[in-house]
Amino acid sequence: MSAAKPTTLYDKIWNDHLVHEAEDGTCLLYIDRHLVHEVTSPQAFEGLRTAGRKVHSPEKTLAVVDHNVPTTDRSKPNPDPESAEQIAALAENARDFGVTYYNEHDKRQGVVHVIGPEQGFTLPGTTIVCGDSHTSTHGAFGALAHGIGTSEVEHVLATQTLIQKKAKNMRVTVDGDLPDGVTAKDIILAIIGEIGTAGGTGYVLEYAGDAIRALSMEGRMTVCNMSIEGGARAGLIAPDEKAYAYLKGRPMAPTGANWDAAMRYWDTLRSDEGAHFDHELRLDAAALPPIVTWGTSPEDVISITGRVPNPADIADEAKRLSKERALAYMGLTPGTRITDIKIDRMFIGSCTNGRIEDLRAAAKVAEGKTVNGNVSAMIVPGSGLVKEQAEAEGLDKIFVKAGFEWREPGCSMCLAMNPDKLAPEERCASTSNRNFEGRQGFKGRTHLVSPAMAAAAAIAGHFVDIREWR
């Protein structure tokens, strides 16, 4: 009998959830976990209601309000009627269909990709979907997780399955140790800078190497979160003792004999030696600097010690024109030092960098300092539980004393779907995941950075090299 063919982590999870494969490669995949929020779910629930269908597995569905909620006083009505309507619809739909729901007054509420792991709803080896592109976050636990559209949300609600075609495998290995001041956010921005926003198209990425293993679970979530910005369907990291320690004792995690059985399965969730990857990429962690984006795409990355690039140096005409447009939108001049770029706003939060580790990093920078008088800076915890923990550690007092605003949890300024927005031509140092035109507000200018880099920029009034921060 021949030995089993070495298999990748992605292939293992896929094969364990494959219900049926048609001759053309179209597959029906079983879905273990479904996360739902207020923006992409109303039409899906209405479709069920119209057809007289129930939610197939309400116990495998978790709903939370996050995109549209204000991060200020929640005792007042939502100022935006459409947002208020979507929030009310989610509450009604969750009640009518028997789905667990965390509303804006529940301390378990927060950004959907923060609360999933926090509650132990996210587990290794599971398939997870959500009507949100940053569902890849959950891959940090060795889950196959990706975003879906509204029609697919309805399909999963009704059947607990999803029609898919299998992706290819790409492994990204980050060797060595990260220098001081360089973080998980810098790793993923460097990867996107290397492969571009289309480099991962058609792939599921597996992140590996000493630098990835050394990351905390929060750091791993940051890396997997932005897989979609590299064009990938999903991002994965093989689970290990760090993942198990994070999950053990969480409200929705298995207990007792079920935990032991789960652990036996989870320990098989790693790519076999000799498994085939369709593409491989290696980075040297020791060579990575703190990174800032300069343009309107996450691939527009540069070292904090660099200068704004000159599009005239780009041979490809289409790409040159694209970068010229980006520079014009961002109001930047080629050759400008990144450290000479002044900011108006600062945002720390989002499903990329709104966890307790991120807030601790920012507080370490902010302690004993004062926000620059020309900068408005806000800190938005990723969930009510993150907020509660930060306050127990006194981080909120550090921020408030330094002049940062301390807000309620939600998606906030990551996207312009709530009151937290940039005014036209305001420049923001942001820990979120997208710097597209208008992402944070009409004509707003976004620079993606790590939490420590964002906090330092807010205090200095311009970008600074966090490695030299005193």
UniProtKB/Swiss-Prot annotation:
It holds the Pfam family Aconitase. HAMAP family: LeuC_type1. It comes from the Bacteria. Pathway: Amino-acid biosynthesis; L-leucine biosynthesis; L-leucine from 3-methyl-2-oxobutanoate: step 2/4. Catalyzes the isomerization between 2-isopropylmalate and 3-isopropylmalate, via the formation of 2-isopropylmaleate. Keywords: 4Fe-4S, Amino-acid biosynthesis, Branched-chain amino acid biosynthesis, Iron, Iron-sulfur, Leucine biosynthesis, Lyase, Metal-binding. Binds 1 [4Fe-4S] cluster per subunit. Belongs to the aconitase/IPM isomerase family. LeuC type 1 subfamily. Heterodimer of LeuC and LeuD. One of its GO terms (molecular function) is 4 iron, 4 sulfur cluster binding. GO terms for biological process: L-leucine biosynthetic process. This is 3-isopropylmalate dehydratase large subunit. Its EC number is 4.2.1.33. Its cofactor is [4Fe-4S] cluster. [4Fe-4S] cluster binds at C351, C411, C414. InterPro entries: 3-IsopropMal_deHydase_lsu, Acnase/IPM_dHydase_lsu_aba_1/3, Acoase/IPM_deHydtase_lsu_aba, Aconitase_4Fe-4S_BS, Aconitase_4Fe-4S_dom, IPM_dehydratase_rel_enz, IPMI_cat. It is an enzyme of class 4 (lyase). It comes from Rhodopseudomonas palustris (strain BisB5). It catalyses: (2R,3S)-3-isopropylmalate = (2S)-2-isopropylmalate. The gene is leuC.
